[in-house]
UniProtKB/Swiss-Prot annotation:
<feature type="binding site">
    <location>
        <position position="11"/>
    </location>
    <ligand>
        <name>ATP</name>
    </ligand>
</feature>
<feature type="active site" description="Pros-phosphohistidine intermediate">
    <location>
        <position position="117"/>
    </location>
</feature>
<dbReference type="GO" id="GO:0006974">
    <property type="term" value="P:DNA damage response"/>
</dbReference>
<feature type="binding site">
    <location>
        <position position="114"/>
    </location>
    <ligand>
        <name>ATP</name>
    </ligand>
</feature>
<dbReference type="GO" id="GO:0006241">
    <property type="term" value="P:CTP biosynthetic process"/>
</dbReference>
<dbReference type="GO" id="GO:0004550">
    <property type="term" value="F:nucleoside diphosphate kinase activity"/>
</dbReference>
<protein>
    <recommendedName>
        <fullName>Nucleoside diphosphate kinase</fullName>
        <ecNumber>2.7.4.6</ecNumber>
    </recommendedName>
</protein>
<keyword id="KW-0808">Transferase</keyword>
<dbReference type="InterPro" id="IPR023005">
    <property type="entry name" value="Nucleoside_diP_kinase_AS"/>
</dbReference>
<dbReference type="InterPro" id="IPR034907">
    <property type="entry name" value="NDK-like_dom"/>
</dbReference>
<dbReference type="GO" id="GO:0006228">
    <property type="term" value="P:UTP biosynthetic process"/>
</dbReference>
<keyword id="KW-0460">Magnesium</keyword>
<keyword id="KW-0479">Metal-binding</keyword>
<feature type="binding site">
    <location>
        <position position="87"/>
    </location>
    <ligand>
        <name>ATP</name>
    </ligand>
</feature>
<feature type="binding site">
    <location>
        <position position="59"/>
    </location>
    <ligand>
        <name>ATP</name>
    </ligand>
</feature>
<keyword id="KW-0067">ATP-binding</keyword>
<dbReference type="GO" id="GO:0005758">
    <property type="term" value="C:mitochondrial intermembrane space"/>
</dbReference>
Length: 151
């Protein structure tokens, strides 16, 4: 069993469209363990830190307005290769390039409303988890089905 963690956020469009349970179930069904979850409306400051590499880009003001337009479900998942596999479960950033069966391939059509965010590396995951969650908000617990998932 791996203790690798990733940050997955269901963006305002995913929350407003009632997709939370379907998205969470994709990760649970795969065998990943949920260790952090909260519904938040992020501040501009938090989003500027989260998307620091995009702050100077022309699309950033529109993205910032969208990401502060409603609640986001912030989650932390744990398990073997969860960062890479989380990206596979989500699908390509541009939903039109996402395969059917992925979250974005099934639920999104527009890159500006692509339902979810997922960490793109182990390092990014740790940075994002630290931004969105306090240490005491993450729960270390035993998933009893682990022996049915891992050798």
């Amino acid at each position: 069993m791996s203790d690798e963690r990733t940050f997955i956020a269901i963006k305002p469009d995913g929350v407003q469209r009632g997709l939370i349970s379907q998205i969470l179930s994709r990760f649970e069904s795969r065998g990943y363990k949920l260790v952090g979850i909260k519904l938040v409306t992020p501040t501009e400051n938090l989003l500027k830190q989260h998307y620091a590499e995009h702050v100077e880009k022309p699309f950033f003001p529109k993205m910032l307005a969208y990401m502060t337009s409603g609640p986001i479900l912030a989650t932390v998942w744990e398990g073997k290769d969860v960062v890479k596999q989380g990206r596979v479960i989500l699908g390509a950033t541009n939903p039109l390039n996402s395969a059917p069966g992925t979250i974005r391939g099934d639920f999104a059509l527009d890159m500006g409303r692509n339902v979810c965010h997922g960490s793109d590396s182990v390092e990014s995951a740790q940075r994002e988890i630290d931004l969105w969650f306090k240490k005491e908000e993450l729960v270390d617990w035993k998933l009893n089905q682990l022996s049915w998932i891992y050798e």
